[in-house]
Amino acid sequence: MQITETSADGLRREFKVTVPADEIETRVANRLSEIGKTIKIPGFRPGKVPMALLKQRYGQSVMGEVLEQAVNDGSAKAVEEHKLRPALQPKVEVTKFEAGSDLEFSMAVELLPDFEPADMAAIAVEKPVVEVADAMVDDGLKRIAANRKTSAPLEAERPAQSGDIVVIDFDGSVDGEKRPGMKGEDHELELGSGSFIPGFEDQLVGAAKGEHRTVTVTFPENYHAAELSGKEAVFEVDVKDIRVPKAAEIDEDFAKSFGFDDLAGMRDAIRERMQADYASMSRMRAKRQLLDRLAETHDFPVPTGMVDIEFDQIWRRLQQELKDGEADPEDKEKDEEGLKAEYRAIAERRVRLGLLLSEVGRRNNITVTRDELGQAVVAEAQRYPGQERQVFDFFRNNPQAVEGLRAPIFEDKVVDFILGQVKLTERTVSVEDLMRDPEEDEGPTAAA
């Protein structure tokens, strides 16, 4: 087998591979002999079938099999001999072959770039943090109590107003026809909550206890029941009672109703939950800033094929969002050429950062353990309460799905490793500042 490098351009390499005719013939003969040992043909004992008959019956399929294997072997040998690090599967094209002649094929391959990661200790990252104050815990308790609210009778009769709870019977129709789910009795509705069709609650403001009202509304265009989208509906409504909402009392009994020993224990749990949530958001902001700094300090070439794959995924997602009306309003105003240029730059950034994180992980022996993969599977199952068994079964029967969890775990471990190397400073901010999109302050930044 002869391997000749024919082109070297950036990360792209091209080779010409020649497999001698006698090697092809030997491979074919060996494969036919293997078949002859097991194949059953009437009139012949296994292993005694004439080679001529084997060639007649199986020669064509065996030749195809041998050529495919020869190409695979030749490609692998080219990679090994030239110490290549392919970024993607090499592209192979058979350029010459006739029965009894040499096999010639070309192989084009893009390589992973060789580069030196920057000195991480020279990179500065600011991490926004939130201190959970007692007042924040108080607000959290009040929100929980509001969700546990009851209602109390009016001290004096008056018309319903926003914020009141009205007890109603209602019966709706569309185009004069009754529809399922449009009738209810003794339903408690908080006016102004937005829990009913837009406009419904507004038309009950000012109603008195015992009053009957006809309410006309229009279902939103994006209503979940497509047959009702954009339709006008008429509801006959009887206001049976008007009550005022009453938040639950925040006391020891309130805490015990949630399974806590006392109110202090509930406050501690709320504080810990807040601290965990804000710590997660804080890490996300630090990670984003780190990736921005890494993108600024690294500009090595990246394989075009990898960028093409990443761009295609982004572009398909964008096209679906545009179709569903969920795309960024700014994207809707841009021409296709401008959008493609913008998102190709994002694709290139993502590929470069991915290669950088992979190299940092490789150099520092960062790996993903079986236990970490198992914990990730458990976390996925917890996202689907009541369906945990089905989730576990899915991952058990689909090992490739488990492997799909490896990349994000690896990325997080490498990011945490780098954050431990950089000059990391913390800055105390408000909850509003922590939640604010950094692009609002820093201008557009291509997401990693």
Curated annotation (Swiss-Prot):
<dbReference type="GO" id="GO:0061077">
    <property type="term" value="P:chaperone-mediated protein folding"/>
</dbReference>
<dbReference type="InterPro" id="IPR008880">
    <property type="entry name" value="Trigger_fac_C"/>
</dbReference>
<dbReference type="GO" id="GO:0043022">
    <property type="term" value="F:ribosome binding"/>
</dbReference>
<feature type="domain" description="PPIase FKBP-type">
    <location>
        <begin position="163"/>
        <end position="248"/>
    </location>
</feature>
<dbReference type="InterPro" id="IPR027304">
    <property type="entry name" value="Trigger_fact/SurA_dom_sf"/>
</dbReference>
<keyword id="KW-0963">Cytoplasm</keyword>
<dbReference type="InterPro" id="IPR046357">
    <property type="entry name" value="PPIase_dom_sf"/>
</dbReference>
<comment type="similarity">
    <text>Belongs to the FKBP-type PPIase family. Tig subfamily.</text>
</comment>
<dbReference type="GO" id="GO:0051083">
    <property type="term" value="P:'de novo' cotranslational protein folding"/>
</dbReference>
<dbReference type="Pfam" id="PF05698">
    <property type="entry name" value="Trigger_C"/>
</dbReference>
<dbReference type="GO" id="GO:0003755">
    <property type="term" value="F:peptidyl-prolyl cis-trans isomerase activity"/>
</dbReference>
<dbReference type="InterPro" id="IPR036611">
    <property type="entry name" value="Trigger_fac_ribosome-bd_sf"/>
</dbReference>
<keyword id="KW-0131">Cell cycle</keyword>
<keyword id="KW-0143">Chaperone</keyword>
<dbReference type="InterPro" id="IPR037041">
    <property type="entry name" value="Trigger_fac_C_sf"/>
</dbReference>
<dbReference type="Pfam" id="PF05697">
    <property type="entry name" value="Trigger_N"/>
</dbReference>
<dbReference type="InterPro" id="IPR001179">
    <property type="entry name" value="PPIase_FKBP_dom"/>
</dbReference>
<dbReference type="GO" id="GO:0043335">
    <property type="term" value="P:protein unfolding"/>
</dbReference>
<dbReference type="GO" id="GO:0015031">
    <property type="term" value="P:protein transport"/>
</dbReference>
<dbReference type="GO" id="GO:0051301">
    <property type="term" value="P:cell division"/>
</dbReference>
<dbReference type="GO" id="GO:0044183">
    <property type="term" value="F:protein folding chaperone"/>
</dbReference>
<keyword id="KW-0413">Isomerase</keyword>
<keyword id="KW-0132">Cell division</keyword>
<comment type="function">
    <text>Involved in protein export. Acts as a chaperone by maintaining the newly synthesized protein in an open conformation. Functions as a peptidyl-prolyl cis-trans isomerase.</text>
</comment>
<dbReference type="InterPro" id="IPR005215">
    <property type="entry name" value="Trig_fac"/>
</dbReference>
<dbReference type="GO" id="GO:0005737">
    <property type="term" value="C:cytoplasm"/>
</dbReference>
<dbReference type="InterPro" id="IPR008881">
    <property type="entry name" value="Trigger_fac_ribosome-bd_bac"/>
</dbReference>
<dbReference type="Pfam" id="PF00254">
    <property type="entry name" value="FKBP_C"/>
</dbReference>
<protein>
    <recommendedName>
        <fullName>Trigger factor</fullName>
        <ecNumber>5.2.1.8</ecNumber>
    </recommendedName>
</protein>
<keyword id="KW-0697">Rotamase</keyword>
